[in-house]
Amino acid sequence: MARQCELTGKKANNGYTVSHSHRRTKCLQKANLQTKRIWSPTLKRWLKLQVSTKVIKDLKRKSIDALLKI
């Protein structure tokens, strides 16, 4: 399974680690993903998804069905 949010598609970002002398080395900035069990009222079952923490925050305001339509 790829390290990617299953709802938003967020994934790792390529970036640089910059030292004090301004030497740059490549690094991979991974998305903050968590495995979460989410109840879907329309499907009437639990969904086990790997989602970003932003989605978890949005789930407190909206239902999973509203987020899936986006």
Curated annotation (Swiss-Prot):
Q: What's the short name of a Pfam family annotated to this entry?
A: Ribosomal_L28
Q: Which GO terms describe its biological process?
A: translation
Q: Where in the cell is it found?
A: Plastid, Cyanelle
Say yes or no: keyword Ribosomal protein present.
Answer: yes
GO terms for molecular function, please? structural constituent of ribosome
Q: Which PANTHER family match?
A: 39S RIBOSOMAL PROTEIN L28, MITOCHONDRIAL, LARGE RIBOSOMAL SUBUNIT PROTEIN BL28M
The name under which this protein is listed is Large ribosomal subunit protein bL28c
Q: Which gene encodes it?
A: rpl28
